[in-house]
Amino acid sequence: MGHSRRPVGGEKKSRGFGRSKAVADVGDGRQTGGKPQVKKATFESTKKKEIGVSDLTLLSKISNEAINDNLKLRFQHDEIYTYIGHVLVSVNPFRDLGIYTDKVLESYRGKNRLEVPPHVFAVAESAYYNMKSYNDNQCVIISGESGAGKTEAAKRIMQYIASVSGGSDSSIQHTKDMVLATNPLLESFGNAKTLRNNNSSRFGKYLELEFNSRGEPVGANITNYLLEKSRVVGQITNERNFHIFYQFTKAAPQKYRDMFGIQQPQSYLYTSRSKCYDVPGVDDAAEFRDTLNAMGVIGMSEPEQDQVFRMLSAILWIGNIQFVEDDSGNAAIPDQSTVNYVAYLLEVDPGQVNKALTIRIMETARGGRRGSVYEVPLNTVQALAVRDALAKAIYFNLFDWIVERVNQSLTARGTVANSIGILDIYGFEIFEKNSFEQLCINYVNEKLQQIFIQLTLKAEQDEYAREQIQWTPIKYFDNKVVCSLIEDKRPPGVFAALNDACATAHADSGAADNTFVGRLNFLSQNPNFENRQGQFIVKHYAGDVSYAVEGMTDKNKDQLLKDLLNLVGSSSNEFVHTLFPNQVNQDDKRRPPTASDKIKASANDLVATLMKAQPSYIRTIKPNDNKAPKEYNEGNVLHQIKYLGLQENVRIRRAGFAYRQTFDKFVERFYLLSPKTSYAGDYTWTGDAESGARQILKDTSIPQEEFQMGITKVFVKTPETLFALEAMRDRYWHNMAIRIQRAWRNYLRYRIECAIRIQRFWRRMTGGLELIKVRDQGHKVLQGRKERRRMSLLGSRRFLGDYLGIANKGGPGEMIRNGAGIGSDTVLFSCRGEVLVSKFGRSSKPSPRIFVLTNRHFIIVAQNLVNGQLVISAERTIPIGAIKSVSTSNLKDDWFSFVIGAQEPDPLMNCVFKTELFTHLSNALHGQLNIKIADHIEYNKKPGKLATVKVVKEPGSSNVDTYKSSTIHTSAGEPPSSVSKPTPRGKQVAARPVTKGKLLRPGGPGGGPSKLAARPMPARQPVPQPAASQAPAPQPAAVPRPVPQPVAAVAASHTRTASSGSMRAPPPPPPVSPPAPKKPMAKVLYDFSSAQSNELSIKAGELVEIVSKEGNGWWLCMNTTTSVQGWTPQAYLEEQKAAPPPPPPAAPRSTPATNGTATAAAAKAKPAPPAPPAKRPNMAGRKMAPPPPSAPRDSAVSMNSQDSSGGSGRGTPNSASNASLAGGLAEALRQRQEAMHGKQDDDDEW
């Protein structure tokens, strides 16, 4: 902080400091010649909306009230730091805001003041950076009244410097630890609770951190000022003695209690006089542990600690010595035991203690020779004063010894190159009764204020002169006259008059005070002084303060009686001699230095030290006197604003220009605002920084009267101009963010489209492996005992499960889910089907329903129209655990029943996806599903009444099963042992462009055509020509949907026929009707005589028509002559192969091979007649009539469709006579697949 003393010309290389090279070169006001090294602008992602103004120089109106309003606004939003140029203003929040964490600390490392919000870490960073960069000693002056947060600010500066100063050496780290340990140690001995502050510093401290040439701390030195030793012997109500007395008496270990007789603070006069023993929120025992730990870190040995606590114990017990008047009116000590214990602690003779406290030795002198010696008894008042003087002297010297011991441990371990000083001294004090202590404190604050004004004004004037800027001087209050009023000897000031009074009337304090009042009359002509009866007023910069004269001369003498010096000199304790090293010189007649002399000398030494360093300033403000968070007393703060001179500081800083910055830094901040200095966020200016700054101001239309160009800096006149520049910069980022968002959204769309393509390709490659596994499991569920439909065995068939989307959100599936009350059950399977419904007075009839299988229930859902509204409801809910078995036939029909055995009838249902339903139900029951497969279906039509539905196979019947009169008529299916065909491979097509986006060119973000699209297509294979006996089935023309594809890709892949309204290709003709299928025939090999009425007698050599085949060794045959049907052993027959049909356009489908082996074996020898079948249908003498056409019914795929090639799987011819029909269907399917591939359907999912 402060005003940099950086050289204008030349270049000074820094050595390994924390900032990046770009920041250092740009931000230091130094140019390396030619084009400046400008760091690329970045958006401040952590930048918050500014509350008020962060720099008071940017206020539009400069007044104390405006400053107060801005500080209040920021305080209410937890913004406690505000700048005045390089000066930091801090308002005490009286609570933890979480702004001193390691993360916050790291955010300020290596950052310029303008890059981050105001903070005490920014002050520390600036001081450390300037020290390393320019080898200048730095100092941070913290000022403000008691309780404003000065000590906290000093600790945070030490925290920051210890963190960023580097150094991995163990000695460097030990030095850091010791420096940080000085805080709790000196606070316990030097701080106390006052009415205005619970941790008020009752001494001044100047900590000087010493660094080597690498910026690593190698040592430190502490100078203490103005310890308030009078607090040791007396405090006002609700205040406390120094913290250490309460820490020691409350938490002393048993060793010290035994050695020194330590008791609770209520037992001692010096700690109980004010009746205040505790501080809200402070744990004295924990603080004492921190104090002991700090002593250990400093290196204080255990014997040294014992001696320190021995002296503290002696002070406490000295305060308990009481005096009474004897018969002669002199002071006497009634309780000798306390005197004896004090003598034990000081290691002196008790008689000497008694004598030193009650008798004063007077000596007369004549003509320069020693005269007579008299022992003058003291009265009780005088004895109490002597007692308190001894206690204060011991504590004062003990505090000095602790500081010296700390300095001894912090002695520099290496060569000291530079230093950073931190001044923490209690601020300006105004009480109801102000005495000598307040005069000294306020005097030192006047000296610090004088430094602040002189250096601030001087630095401002020097900068304007150096930069050749025209400005108007600002009037301000120079407090040098107040300092002279207090410290001057000619004419005599307050201190000189006080010393003269002490020397003239030294024997009687009352007479000395009266003499002092008389001397003050000579100062009445000074405009900053007023003399009143018994008091005088000094007009300080912080306000008028009235000081009481009474007792001021005694405090100024500040000398220990020779009797007490002789007492401590007689001690056998070496530590006591260390505290009082000066021997009593009986012959020295010179006046010893007074307290005012000492404070004057200390203040001048401090000023001389600060003047040799580059200063930084922190002005602390106390928002209220109640130490309450979030309370802002405008009157109190306004008073502090006035006496701290913040308004004058703002005026001096403004001086006509609210903002100034080096050319390099200005260009780095605002180069985005000019098209000649930036392009797409990059710095493009090739000239020097000064011309770049001029160009930016020109392109942003800033009037000439609003700025001036100096030698190395640009000066902006009003804060509104700076706000306009910052607003334009923010708008640039806003526009850039919109462009980035647009590009990012386009990129995301590109990624999503690519992901969809990859997923689609993966699904095509894998073909839904999990679904295939479930499909293959379905073959095992049927146990190879039930004929299969040909469409069920397609390689593309998948067991998708939830066909109706019951588990989906939205759409019809959600309507069904809500209407059926499925709730949170997991849906395993859903499709449409039929349930056999019995109606009174009518025959049973299939009725459409919806089947839903969940992990717990099987639900039959009905859809009804009620008052013109579709109502969906669960007609029946069956727990899956209640399903005892499933009954189905061994033919290819889709009917089955659930045997439940409940009070309700078992449902008889028709579902085209029966096998898939059985599979999911078996998995839900963990494989415990019992499936009964026979030539009929059993179910309980009524509770306890078992009904049977026969299933018969009729040749030539349609692919749609029909139900009539408890009989299901179906056609022949694939053999029960059939399995699914392999998954068909898709036809390779040309690759499409990667994206259809408008911002991205085809081929992806990099542009260019897709590489896949450039691959040559495989040569198109000729279609096999049909035989002459069959009309060819023309291939339908595929009309692909248009896609955005590059011209090159289209040309490289394939050519397309242009389609238009006038040039549309004619539709393909309908397929030729297939010839009537031939009936399967069998030749009789052996004679067979029927044994039952349902068997057919045959003779060798006859031809019989095969009606149906059973897997149990019996065939149902019909005599073509008599048209009689019956059961015939399969081994007695040889099936005659039908003549092959003409070759279809597509590859003919292979038919199942006949059992030629069995036939050949039968031809060799006639086997024994097989055993009669276990159960045969009663068909003796009955002619099998073809079933009537069935009414259309609903199904999962298309329950209303009778198309034999539909998804129901019911249009598959099974006999050899239907081979031509199979060929036609195969050709139609092949053409449909080619059309689908030609359209490049991206949404085809199995």
UniProtKB/Swiss-Prot annotation:
**Cellular location of this protein?**
Cytoplasm, Cytoskeleton, Actin patch
Instruction: List, alphabetically, the Pfam families matched.
Output: Myo1_CA, Myosin_head, Myosin_TH1, SH3_1
User: Is Phosphoprotein one of the keywords?
Assistant: yes
Q: Where is the composition biased (Basic and acidic residues)?
A: 1229-1240
The segment(s) forming the TH1 domain are: 788-976
Description of post-translational modifications: Phosphorylation of the TEDS site (Ser-372) is required for the polarization of the actin cytoskeleton. Phosphorylation probably activates the myosin-I ATPase activity.
Q: Which GO terms describe its molecular function?
A: actin filament binding; Arp2/3 complex binding; ATP binding; hydrolase activity; microfilament motor activity
The residue ranges of the IQ domain are 734-754, 755-780
Q: Where is the SH3 domain?
A: 1077-1138
- Would the keyword Transferase be found if you checked this record's keyword annotation? no
Q: Which PROSITE patterns match?
A: MYOSIN_MOTOR, SH3, TH1
Task: State the coiled-coil residue ranges.
Answer: none
Q: Which Gene3D superfamilies match?
A: 1.10.10.820, 1.20.5.4820, 1.20.58.530, Kinesin motor domain, Myosin VI head, motor domain, U50 subdomain, SH3 Domains
Q: Where is the composition biased (Low complexity)?
A: 1151-1166, 1214-1228
The Myosin motor domain extends over 51-730
Which InterPro entries does the UniProt record give? Fungal_myosin-I_SH3 (IPR035535), Kinesin_motor_dom_sf (IPR036961), Myo1_CA (IPR054489), Myosin_head_motor_dom-like (IPR001609), Myosin_TH1 (IPR010926), MYSc_Myo1 (IPR036072), P-loop_NTPase (IPR027417), SH3-like_dom_sf (IPR036028)
* Stretch list, region Actin-binding: 419-501
Superkingdom to which the source organism belongs: Eukaryota
GO cellular component annotations of the record: actin cortical patch; cell cortex of cell tip; mating projection tip; medial cortex; myosin I complex; plasma membrane raft; prospore membrane
GO biological processes: actin cortical patch assembly; actin cortical patch localization; actin filament organization; endocytosis; mitotic cytokinesis
Query: Binding of ATP: at which residues?
Result: G144, E145, S146, G147, A148, G149, K150, T151
Task: State where it is primarily located.
Answer: cytoplasm
Sequence segments annotated as region (Disordered): 1-41, 956-1080, 1127-1246
Q: What is known of its domains?
A: The myosin motor domain displays actin-stimulated ATPase activity and generates a mechanochemical force. The tail domain participates in molecular interactions that specify the role of the motor domain. It is composed of several tail homology (TH) domains, namely a putative phospholipid-binding myosin tail domain (also named TH1), an Ala- and Pro-rich domain (TH2), followed by an SH3 domain and a C-terminal acidic domain (TH3).
**Protein name (database record):** Myosin-1
Q: Which organism is it from?
A: Aspergillus terreus (strain NIH 2624 / FGSC A1156)
Recall the taxonomic lineage recorded for the source organism. Answer: Eukaryota, Fungi, Dikarya, Ascomycota, Pezizomycotina
